[in-house]
Structures are given as C-alpha cells and as structure tokens.
C-alpha cells in the first residue's frame, strides 16, 4: 500500500511565547530558543531521511523563519514556498500583546482557557481604529474587509484553514509531492481536528509543542492512517504540557 507522508511543524518559540503573551497576528520573531528548535527540527528531519518538494507557511515571520531554518538544515533552501494568511495563527483580538498569566489573574483560569482553547469562543474583539487591526498592515492589502478578523475562535480559524487545505495543499499531496507545512499552534490545531475528526471537547485539550515535526501518514484515499512526533517522547510531552500551562495564573 502506498503511503503518503505530510510533515507539520509549529514554529519555534517566539519572543512573545517566551514572554507568555497572546500573539495572534502580531508579527513577532523567534527567540534564540526558537531558532535552536527550528534548527533541531531540520537536523532531525534530515537524520530521518526526509526531503520535500514543496513547502507552505503563513505570512508571519516566526513561521517563515522556522521554515527557513528547517530547509537550511535539509540543504533545501531552494525549495518553492507558498505563504498564505490562511495559515496564520488564530487572531486573538484585543488580547493580543497581553500577558496570559496576568490575564488569567484578572479574568480567571477557566475564562482564559476558554478564550485560548474553546472551540467557538472568541476573545474580546478589536475595533477597526486599533493599531493592531490587520487592515492597517500592507501584507493584507488585497483582502476584503470581510476577510480581515477583529477576533477569531478556533471554529473561525478552521473556516479559513480547511478550504485552503482542500483546495491548495491536498491536491499537491495527491499529485505525489512531498509537503511540509510550518505554521502556528491554532492553525495546525484546526487542521489536526479536521484530519482526525476530533470532537470540540477533544480539541480543547490538544496542545502542539513548538518546533517538533508532526508526521501524518495517509492511505491511497488520503485518509490518515496514523500520526506521530519525531524526537524524544518525554521532551515532547514536557513541551506540550508547558503550552497548556501558559494560560494559568501564577
């Protein structure tokens, strides 16, 4: 049976991950640790014998630079890459820039967990005159006002990620190309929920660690057979737990 593999990677730790702040569409770069994570992911993929024909990422530099470091480690810096806002992190609205633990102290752990992980829960929205509104950013100049979020739930993130998967990424896999996607915690959670047919309750508890390759294997009908992380299982579990704890009061 022919098996098709897809590799997903959440960007390495960003400067705002390190500061425990809601990031969303804010274009913060990788921390030093994040660069190291991305380089380690590239080495791991190379050691495991992976190479690719095409790459996808968002229009945010923490994901773009993660992909650069991975491809550099694979000696595939030349690889064609498509960047799309549809793979951006979920937009966190008026929470963007706020410290997660301080926000939990103010509103309570459960409210922040719902904002971070609730399926259809949207954080407080931005207003269009807020400097954080994406309509002020030239990279989104070609988007319609209806496409520009003031806030997003995971459900709304799915509404942009899954059509992009079905219309753009999946056809490339079906043509036989080997694909890697470097994206974000919630855009990847959106895709994982769809691929694994997870319930709203199950996705609430899913935490994707930074900088760890996640491999999906598909059968000839492009249905997922299994998925697994590459690397040390204990280290990966610890990183996932750290993601879960970010939104708790200290």
UniProtKB/Swiss-Prot annotation:
CDD domains, sorted: HP_PGM_like (cd07067)
Listed transmembrane segments: none
Site residues (Transition state stabilizer), renumbered to this chain: 184
One function term, GO molecular function aspect: phosphoglycerate mutase activity
Keywords noted in UniProt: Gluconeogenesis, Glycolysis, Isomerase
Listed pathway(s): Carbohydrate degradation; glycolysis; pyruvate from D-glyceraldehyde 3-phosphate: step 3/5
Any Pfam family the entry gives: His_Phos_1
InterPro entries referenced in this protein's UniProt entry, alphabetically: His_Pase_superF_clade-1, His_PPase_superfam, PG/BPGM_mutase_AS, Phosphogly_mut1
Function: Catalyzes the interconversion of 2-phosphoglycerate and 3-phosphoglycerate.
Family of the protein in this entry: Belongs to the phosphoglycerate mutase family. BPG-dependent PGAM subfamily.
Name this protein carries in UniProt: 2,3-bisphosphoglycerate-dependent phosphoglycerate mutase
Originating organism: Cronobacter sakazakii (strain ATCC BAA-894)
């Amino acid at each position: 049976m022919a098996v098709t593999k897809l590799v997903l990677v959440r960007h390495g730790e960003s400067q705002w991950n390190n500061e425990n702040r809601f990031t969303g569409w804010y274009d913060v770069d990788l921390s030093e640790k994040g660069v190291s994570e991305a380089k380690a992911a590239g080495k791991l993929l190379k050691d495991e014998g992976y190479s690719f024909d095409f790459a996808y990422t968002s229009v945010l530099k923490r994901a773009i630079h993660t992909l650069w470091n991975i491809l550099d480690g694979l000696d595939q810096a030349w690889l064609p890459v498509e960047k799309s806002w549809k793979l951006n992190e979920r937009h966190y609205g008026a929470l963007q820039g706020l410290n997660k633990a301080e926000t939990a102290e103010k509103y309570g752990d459960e409210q922040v967990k719902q904002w971070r992980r609730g399926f259809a829960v949207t954080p407080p929205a931005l207003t269009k005159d807020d400097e954080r509104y994406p309509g002020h950013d030239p990279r989104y100049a070609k988007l319609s006002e209806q496409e520009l979020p003031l806030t997003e739930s995971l459900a709304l993130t799915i509404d942009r990620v899954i059509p992009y998967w079905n219309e753009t990424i999946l056809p490339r896999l079906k043509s036989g190309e080997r694909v890697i996607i470097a994206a974000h915690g919630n855009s990847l959670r959106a895709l994982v929920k769809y691929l694994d047919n997870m319930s709203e309750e199950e996705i609430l508890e899913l935490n994707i660690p930074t900088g760890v390759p996640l491999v999906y294997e598909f059968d000839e009908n492009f249905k997922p057979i299994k998925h697994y992380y590459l690397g040390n299982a204990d280290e990966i579990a610890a990183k996932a737990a750290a993601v879960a704890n970010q939104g708790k009061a200290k």
